[in-house]
Structures are given as C-alpha cells and as structure tokens.
Amino acid sequence: MPSSVTALGQARSSGPGMAPSACCCSPAALQRRLPILAWLPSYSLQWLKMDFVAGLSVGLTAIPQALAYAEVAGLPPQYGLYSAFMGCFVYFFLGTSRDVTLGPTAIMSLLVSFYTFHEPAYAVLLAFLSGCIQLAMGVLRLGFLLDFISYPVIKGFTSAAAVTIGFGQIKNLLGLQNIPRPFFLQVYHTFLRIAETRVGDAVLGLVCMLLLLVLKLMRDHVPPVHPEMPPGVRLSRGLVWAATTARNALVVSFAALVAYSFEVTGYQPFILTGETAEGLPPVRIPPFSVTTANGTISFTEMVQDMGAGLAVVPLMGLLESIAVAKAFASQNNYRIDANQELLAIGLTNMLGSLVSSYPVTGSFGRTAVNAQSGVCTPAGGLVTGVLVLLSLDYLTSLFYYIPKSALAAVIIMAVAPLFDTKIFRTLWRVKRLDLLPLCVTFLLCFWEVQYGILAGALVSLLMLLHSAARPETKVSEGPVLVLQPASGLSFPAMEALREEILSRALEVSPPRCLVLECTHVCSIDYTVVLGLGELLQDFQKQGVALAFVGLQVPVLRVLLSADLKGFQYFSTLEEAEKHLRQEPGTQPYNIREDSILDQKVALLKA
C-alpha cells in the first residue's frame, strides 16, 4: 500500500532490483546470471508483506486481462491463463527489475492473431521459437540491435496497435457476430451491421467502461496513506486503494454476476465467454506438426506459414519488455541489465511453450500496478503466478458467465493509453522530420504489421544515412576561410565535404587558404584519409594551404600514420590563422618539423 512504499523507499532504491555489476569474479558473474542471489540474502519480513500485497494486486489484474487478451489473440480463453504464470516464476530467478511482470499483453496478442491463424498449435510453437531467438540474442549479447528501432517507429506501431485492438473489440462490445478479422473489412462490416447491435451487450459494455474509468480516476487521486493518520481514515483509504487497483477483477465479477442473474431466470441478453477448459495445462513439448482433416502440416510448413512473425514477434516482445523495464528502473532509481532481460524473456517463452503458452512479454499496465503496490523484489511474481494457477484449477467453471462485452471493455480501457496523441504534437514542435517514420509505420501497420515496422525502420535508417552522408558544416568567412563539420566524418560524408571545400576555397578567384576545424570529429576511416590526402594535393597545386585544427588524439594518430604530404595541424585556430596569413615560404607558426616527428613517435607508440 502507499504508506509502505514510502517507508521502504530507501531500501527499494538501493537493494533488490539493481542489476549486479559486471565483474569477472565468480560470485559477481553468478549474481549477474542469477540476480536472485543479489537480493535473496537480505530478504526481510517487511519485504515479504509488500511483495504479497503487490503480487495479489497484479494477480487480480492479470486474470481478467489474460482471458480478454486470449480473445485478441483469437485463441480459447484458457490460453490466456496458460500464458500468465510461467513468466512469474522464471522472472523470480532471472529478472533484474523488481517491478516488471511478464505475461500476455495486448500488442503480443495482436501479433499472435496475425501470425498463428487462430490455431493454438501455431501459437505455442511461435512461443517456443520466439524464446529460442530471444535466448540466443541474450547469450550473444545482441541487445544493441534493438537500438536500431527508433522511438517514432515504436510509437507508430503501438498507436496503430491500440486502434486495431480497440476497434477489434467494438464487435464484442456491441454484440455483433461473424465480423471478419482483417482491419479494413472489420471497419466496413461493423458499420454495415451496426443496426444489429444487441442492446444488452452494448449497455453492459458501456457501463463496464464507465466503471473502469471512474475507478481509474479514483486510483489516480487516492491520497497516500500516512502512519500518523487515524486508523479509520487509513482503513477507508486502504480499501479504496485495493478496490481501484483490482478494478478489472471487480468489474468482470460484477458483469458475470449480472449475467448469472439473468441465466437463472431463463433469459440471457448477453453473449457469454462460454466453456473454458478446466484444470492446469498438461506439460508437453510444443507441437512440431499439426494433423488436420486435409493431412499433416510439417514443422517446415508451419515455419513457412508463420513467416515474418518469427522476426517480428520476438523483436517486438523484447522491445516492449525492455522499454517497460527501463522506464520503471529510471522512475525508481535502479539499473537493469538488458542482455539478462533477453535471457529471462527468452527462457520464459521457451518454458511457457511446454504448458501451452503463447508469446509473452513485459506488461506496462500490470508493471505499473506492481510498482504502485510497493513491490520490493521479483518475489511478488510468485504470488501472481500461484493465483493464476489456482484460478485455472478452481475457477474456470465460473468464467462461463463472463460476458464478452465486459472483457471487451477491459481490453479497450487497457489499450487506450497506448494511443499517444502527445507524440504527434511533440514531434511537430521538436523535429517535424521524425513524423515521417512515425506516420509511415502507423499507416502501414493497418495493412500488415511487418510491413509497417520494416518500412518505418527503413525510413529511419535512410534518415540516419542521409545525415551521415551530408553532415552540416559551419563556415566562417574572414581573412582565412574556416570550415567546421558539425558532426563526425565517415566515408559517406567525404565526397560532400570535398565538394564544399573545393567550391568555397579552390573554385574561386583567387584560391583561398582554408582551416578545417575538426573539434567534433572523433574518428575517421581510410576513405576519409584518402580524401583528405587528395584535398592536400589539390591545395598544393593551387599554391594555397590547408591546415587542421582541433584534432582529437585518435584522429591525429591516424593522419600521422598515413604520412600525408603537406599535412600540418595546430592546437588552436588563432595559431592556424596567424600562420596562414604569413607570406609563402615561412615556417609554420609555433610548430617545427622535429616537434611533428616527436609527436608522431609518441602517438604511434600510444
């Protein structure tokens, strides 16, 4: 509860949840691979109480969401619950964030529906293969590859996913049946058949949405509980906090109770979830082939059918989970290990496939509940996992009465925050060009998810390459021409730099001396060295000088190693300008050949 979070604030910011420091020593290396060893020795009874409350709160949120997300994935409802518990146990041992909860999410469920054709066997196999890919990325420390997906691309995808998922639940909210799943067909048929709306489902769905909104607003405005408050005030605020935190479970239970009340009267105005397979899932290897009425689909054919999903699903799963982990680590003042997170997510999906789970990742909503509940360690996930298992074993018969419109309300309210309207205004104000990859991703994701992500990433990459090939330069006109590249120099930029130098210094009458100010150049490659050598020759032919200023040690070392004819450099711009204003034939100002040789020997030995 809020008071406990405050009381444990210092312990939570300095103890568990911190990624162990990378060290070659055996204990540190073991802690890095098994983060539980870093916080378990100092585990306390106070942390146990906080973790229990947080785990219970997350569990009451996870169960109705799991049922709802299975609908988004196009799978029977029990598969949502099958996917909701394995991450709790794996992350207990391997996670580096105390706040993150792994399980089914709206975005993962949407991707699963795209690539598994609503077939549980495909979904389970996709979880296994995604886990293998994610685990391999963690072992090979390939987490840096995620940095090539820019923030506008991620925002474009999540916004499109929010629209797709939210609109996809309108049919359940209104009680419409036999609506096709492809987005554009879904929009067309929903409006075409709007007159077929079932009043009972629509009213119940809207009431559930209103209740969820009111409870969320109450949750956001519940004042923190302080120990000095009177017991009655603390109790009342604690009850409000508990009720608003478990709002999904309360609303779904309310809707199920209403539906059951109608059922006993013999009249049912709602479309119900229906039968849910009872009991715990069997432990078995993922299906590497599927037998249908038309024959057996081999493993190779299943992989071919999933196609781009084998890249998109593991990639987006990692992006979503690490983004959530980093956000809460920054908020709560601790660090995570991104590569260790890859291992945790990968192993979760691999082991989850043994219990019929579809791909999972970090959930922003449930992680927020976890953090706000005052969780102290990943042990809170154990309570959540046990609660999900108990619901599978004892409550599945009650899920029959949950109206689909109530689950649709839960999904719509969960994905609404994913559509970030502020990002469009922010990018318009900060850098309008970044709207291009965002809009490309957003629009194309309505066609095919992989095309949207690929096109957005490609546009971002082209923008990056263009800035590398055409770096901005600052030019100072004076007695001596000074040209300063605003960023580093690499081989794509050399031709553009050469053209600008020639046009400003040598293709004018009379030719002018030039100082190349290289303060912002941190490194150069061999192509740049060759280009600079050619420029030095061009300047010598015209009888003017090209001097270098502000060379950093790595750059100077490379240029001295190349033995460029006519190469001269100065420590300050004033020295270079004073030298270049002298008559031809004089020695460089404040620099001698022997000092160049001494510096060259010293740099090459460094």
From Swiss-Prot:
GO terms for cellular component: apical plasma membrane; basolateral plasma membrane; endoplasmic reticulum; extracellular exosome; Golgi apparatus; intracellular membrane-bounded organelle; lysosomal membrane; membrane. Disulfide bonds: none annotated. Keywords: Anion exchange, Cell membrane, Ion transport, Lysosome, Membrane, Transmembrane, Transmembrane helix, Transport. It catalyses: hydrogencarbonate(in) + chloride(out) = hydrogencarbonate(out) + chloride(in); sulfate(in) + H(+)(in) = sulfate(out) + H(+)(out); oxalate(in) + chloride(out) = oxalate(out) + chloride(in). Detected in all tissues tested with highest expression observed in brain, kidney, HEVEC and placenta and lowest in pancreas, skeletal muscle, liver, lung and heart. It is found in: Cell membrane; Lysosome membrane; Apical cell membrane; Basolateral cell membrane. It is a multi-pass membrane protein. Residues 73, 118-119, 169-197, 272-307, 363-374, 420-441 are cytoplasmic. GO terms for biological process: chloride transmembrane transport; monoatomic ion transport; oxalate transport; sulfate transmembrane transport. PANTHER family: SULFATE TRANSPORTER. This is Sodium-independent sulfate anion transporter. It comes from Homo sapiens.
